[in-house]
């Protein structure tokens, strides 16, 4: 048992942060390529002026035993994928020493999870403005949600997707907007496993695996999964190769012919 005051000993926290940093693959610094569009519209507003949307792709049929593509769901505009994602992570806030330590531990765990997705093939640019990001990671508990029994339930993490129409200098495209909430109050491994799972959703894995050894398992196993499994990576590779209208230029609805 650690001696009294051990958890408040600065050397312990320095060691913990250093260990997380060593385990964390590099993630790019804030990128000037992440800029907010001039305007974001709801898809309902876009529907009045845009050419009709092609039917969404059907869910994938079961592939080999090496992935779980058939458990993913596409959006009305296709599979949710981008060649590069702008990600904003809530920075460490000003506060007392204990709060600052908790925030740093949270940030280190999120950075580690983010780095593992980068190593698995996700291209990430760091945004220093949340409005410039497609993925925003917040240090807070997710909003309560009704469970199957109708009762409100709390959770440690959640990712929520919304599709919008983005416009800049006459160009328009469908842009995913993902809010990710990761609660504090977990150990470093619990934080990292939660962040890994929710970021997997954010990067397009909108579905769950039936294997507790996968980061995207519907029901976690006894040991936290701290990096994507080979099945997670295989499913991600399949997703990234699928066609999608998300991020591609949109055609405007043709103007009516004169006199009609």
Predicted regions and their residues:
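N-terminal secretory signal peptides that target proteins for export/translocation
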Residues: 1-7
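Disordered inhibitory propeptide/activation segment of secreted metzincin zinc metalloprotease zymogens
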Residues: 2, 21-101, 168-170, 259
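Tryptophan (W) side chains
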Residues: 7-9, 13
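Bacterial N-terminal signal peptides
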Residues: 13-23
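Metalloprotease/metallohydrolase-associated module, dominated by Zn2+-dependent proteases
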Residues: 29-33, 37-42, 156-190, 206-260
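Short, solvent-exposed loop/turn elements at domain surfaces
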Residues: 94-102, 145-148, 224-226
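Metzincin-family zinc-dependent endopeptidase catalytic domain
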Residues: 104-198, 206-209
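Divalent metal-coordination and catalytic microenvironments
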Residues: 117, 197-200, 216, 236
């Amino acid at each position: 048992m650690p001696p009294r005051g051990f958890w408040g000993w600065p050397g312990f926290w320095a060691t913990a942060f250093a260990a997380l940093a060593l385990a964390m693959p590099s993630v790019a610094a804030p990128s000037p390529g992440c800029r907010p569009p001039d305007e974001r519209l709801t898809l309902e507003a876009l529907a009045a002026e845009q050419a009709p949307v092609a039917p969404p792709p059907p869910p994938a049929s079961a592939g080999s035993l090496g992935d779980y593509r058939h458990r993913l769901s596409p959006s009305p505009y296709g599979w949710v994928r981008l060649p590069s994602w702008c990600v904003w992570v809530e920075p460490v806030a000003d506060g007392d020493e204990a709060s600052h330590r908790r925030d740093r531990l949270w940030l280190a765990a999120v950075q580690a999870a983010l780095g593992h997705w980068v190593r698995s093939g996700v291209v990430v640019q760091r945004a220093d403005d949340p409005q410039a990001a497609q993925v925003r990671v917040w240090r807070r508990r997710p909003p309560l949600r009704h469970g199957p029994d109708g009762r409100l339930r709390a959770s440690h993490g959640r990712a929520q997707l919304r599709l919008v129409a983005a416009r800049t200098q006459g160009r328009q495209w469908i842009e995913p907007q993902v809010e990710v909430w990761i609660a504090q109050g977990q150990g470093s491994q619990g934080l990292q496993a939660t962040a890994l799972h929710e970021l997997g959703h954010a990067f397009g894995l909108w579905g769950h695996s039936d294997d507790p050894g996968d980061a995207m398992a519907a029901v976690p196993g006894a040991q936290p999964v701290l990096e994507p499994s080979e099945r997670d990576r295989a499913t991600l590779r399949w997703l990234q190769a699928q066609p999608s209208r998300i991020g591609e230029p949109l055609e405007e609805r043709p103007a009516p012919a004169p006199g009609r």
